[in-house]
Amino acid sequence: MVNSLSRILFCSLLIFSVISLREERLETAPITDDPWDLDGPCQKYVEKLAVVQSEMVACATNWSIPPVVCTKCFQNYINFKQFEYETKNLNNVYSLDNRTCSQVIYDNYLLSYSTDISKALTSEIWEKSRCDSCITIKWNFPQNKSEVSFSERTMQFQNRMYEWRNCVVNYTSGGVLDDNLTNGSKICNLCKTTFDELFGYYWKIYTTPDVDFCVDVETTMNDTIHLWDDVWKCAEKQDRNRDLFGIMITFGTLLLLTALFYAASYIQGGGETRRLIQYARLSDPHGQRSRLLSSGMSDADLVSRVSPGSSVLYNVPIHQTR
């Protein structure tokens, strides 16, 4: 029985070793073993580029509600741009037809999926999110030591956001979505100061010309306002009444200005209604003037109407008297 167990164990170990060796060979086998793969030496670089691109896509998708890709995915973006730089400088690695791998990846074919995906990640995600307004990346591709720094206004916003959230957590014992968070409750009163400071700072930056926040800050602030006003009902009725009163004052002012405008126009006109001339009822013009103004009369016709014995001379063009 001991021999049987030994054989079974030995066979199991042998099978496991064969499977492991096969998987290891598949993972480490050079792509150039395929004689039909013209670009075999470049394939491993494309595979690694695909990995960093997919990691950036996954991070952006995971942090898309709300979109906070700038503050959550900056390291993935750096990794992606770093290896993109490396693939564009593969000048010492060649395909089987002696083209550099950089040419193979980016210039060798009618379509370059690597280029299209890289452009989409850069322009459609990073740049459209205005990440440069919140984050500054000091690129150092040759040394692979790029550094990240957050802008001062972004840090100030995050600090105020943390202060407000800490206030909410402290008074709710960690249960942020507490049933008692209704209008007039303690949390709305105790954390109103920190919320007003947060919103005041955001609004100051938002209304400053030529100064932008990244999308991360804008969407985070919008969600915070909805949470405070609509979910927790912390918006004061006095604030809402003040807004309604302001709208009514504006509307009343517009009506008053319109009435004054028409009153001033009536007074300047002497209080009389304007008389409109109906040209359709006027009689047709008569006499010699109508004949002179007739569009069908030429200079030659005018001369022919003068009697032969008349002493009146007309300056008629030569080409019309011949």
UniProtKB/Swiss-Prot annotation:
Its biological purpose: Modulates the transport of substances from the endosomal to lysosomal compartments. Plays a role in lysosome formation and function in coelomocytes.
Pfam families assigned to the protein according to its UniProt record, in alphabetical order: OSTMP1
Protein name listed in UniProt: Coelomocyte uptake defective protein 15
Keyword annotations: Glycoprotein, Membrane, Signal, Transmembrane, Transmembrane helix
Subcellular location: Membrane
Gene Ontology CC annotations of this record: cytosol; membrane
Glycosylation sites recorded in the entry for this protein: N62, N98, N144, N170, N180, N183, N222
A single BP term in Gene Ontology: lysosome organization
Major localization listed first in the record, in broad terms: membrane
Gene disruption: observed consequences: RNAi-mediated knockdown results in the accumulation of substances in coelomocytes within the body wall cavity, which may be indicative of lysosomal defects.
Membrane topology field: Single-pass membrane protein
First and last residue of the signal peptide: 1-20
Gene designation per UniProt: cup-15
TM spans (from-to): 244-264
Family affiliation: Belongs to the OSTM1 family.
